[in-house]
Amino acid sequence: MQEPPLELTIEPPLSQETFSELWNLLPENNVLSSELSSAMNELPLSEDVANWLDEAPDDASGMSAVPAPAAPAPATPAPAISWPLSSFVPSQKTYPGAYGFHLGFLQSGTAKSVTCTYSPPLNKLFCQLAKTCPVQLWVRSPPPPGTCVRAMAIYKKSEFMTEVVRRCPHHERCPDSSDGLAPPQHLIRVEGNLHAKYLDDRNTFRHSVVVPYEPPEVGSDCTTIHYNFMCNSSCMGGMNRRPIITIITLEDSNGKLLGRNSFEVRVCACPGRDRRTEEENFRKKGEPCPEPPPGSTKRALPPSTSSTPPQKKKPLDGEYFTLQIRGRERFEMFRELNEALELKDAQSGKEPGGSRAHSSHLKAKKGQSTSRHKKPMLKREGLDSD
């Protein structure tokens, strides 16, 4: 008797009956052994399930070859961006050297229209962003061939000297009209010189620009280099209102120092106004100011700028003077003026005794003058009556 064929198209694969048969094949410890492989092959499975079981070992072997992904590391907050610090602080002391190296600047006023101006008493250059700043190089004798000029910026205050001076992130990303030689993070650039080299020191991380030294042209006594400062002194993330000093050094082909000079730089929107303000503050600081007494909260007044000392008022003395006046009208005018002054002194209480005595003396004199004036009139009347 033949068994009726299984209707695989009607029963879904891995139905409840098939699952129960598989479950009964499992041992007590729920681990399949190699003896059950023949029984698994004799199970009545559909064609697609059989193909899936045949391909499963290959997929498992392929998956085992691929390393399992590592567990993701716990998320940590990203550290704040910090610029590298430099352990080397270049000297800013003036050193003329054997060639008498020193700097010079063009004379300019403090008008609002100026884009670059130099203050001799402050030794400070005020300029606008990316504007031409001519710096003159003076030497007594020509340096050897291969000499170069290096410009480097450092912070003026001691607490910031180890930080590298660089542009702010905003100006680094802004496109500028450079020749493509200068890196975007460099603050100082040289205008119109294709031989300029922008260097980043590997040890100190400081930025500098080096150009070959060129002797003065015919009819000129100095060499002029045009520098540009590509970030404002007030930019956040850059200088951040911290004053900087630009150091100009004269070096030979081997890097030996031949001369050094420096000056302070402020990059601002109105160089003339800022120079005028800082020079006025510098003059005020130079004048001696009286110190307030201890415990006093009032501000001391600035000293007077006049050269002549204030004259002290002399107290009124008790002397009397005789003044000869021609004409009675003029005499009466001076007399009233004198009486008014005496009355004012008496009311103010400066010298009450002296003023009273003086006023009584004036009244007595007035009575005498009146009597003297009337006596001749009486004599005249007597003569007329006679």
From Swiss-Prot:
Interaction with DNA: annotated span: 266-273
Q: Where is this region: Interaction with WWOX?
A: 63-102
- Which residue ranges does the UniProt annotation give for the motif Bipartite nuclear localization signal? 298-314
- Residues found modified as N6-acetyllysine: 112, 298, 314, 366, 374-375
Specify the DNA-binding region ranges.
94-285
Q: Where is this cross-link: Glycyl lysine isopeptide (Lys-Gly) (interchain with G-Cter in SUMO)?
A: 379
Q: Where is this site: Interaction with DNA?
A: 112
The record's region (Interaction with E4F1) falls at 249-287
Write out the ranges of the annotated region (Interaction with CCAR2).
Answer: 1-313
Q: Which residues carry this modification: N6-methyllysine?
A: 363, 365, 375
InterPro entries from the xrefs? p53-like_TF_DNA-bd_sf, p53/RUNT-type_TF_DNA-bd_sf, p53_DNA-bd, p53_tetramer_sf, p53_tetrameristn, p53_transactivation_domain, p53_tumour_suppressor
- Give positions of region: Basic (repression of DNA-binding): 361-380
Annotated region (Required for interaction with FBXO42) at 105-229
Location of motif [KR]-[STA]-K motif in this chain is 363-365
**Where does this protein hold Zn(2+)?**
168, 171, 231, 235
Please give the biological process terms from Gene Ontology that the record holds.
cellular senescence; circadian behavior; DNA damage response; entrainment of circadian clock by photoperiod; negative regulation of cell growth; negative regulation of DNA-templated transcription; nucleotide-excision repair; oligodendrocyte apoptotic process
Q: Which PROSITE patterns match?
A: P53 (PS00348)
Q: Which UniProt keywords apply?
A: Acetylation, Activator, Apoptosis, Biological rhythms, Cell cycle, Cytoplasm, Cytoskeleton, DNA-binding, Endoplasmic reticulum, Isopeptide bond, Metal-binding, Methylation, Mitochondrion, Necrosis, Nucleus, Phosphoprotein, Repressor, Transcription, Transcription regulation, Tumor suppressor, Ubl conjugation, Zinc
Q: Which disease is it linked to?
A: p53 is found in increased amounts in a wide variety of transformed cells. p53 is frequently mutated or inactivated in many types of cancer.
Family to which this protein belongs: Belongs to the p53 family.
Please identify the protein, giving its name as recorded.
Cellular tumor antigen p53
Organism, per UniProt?
Felis catus
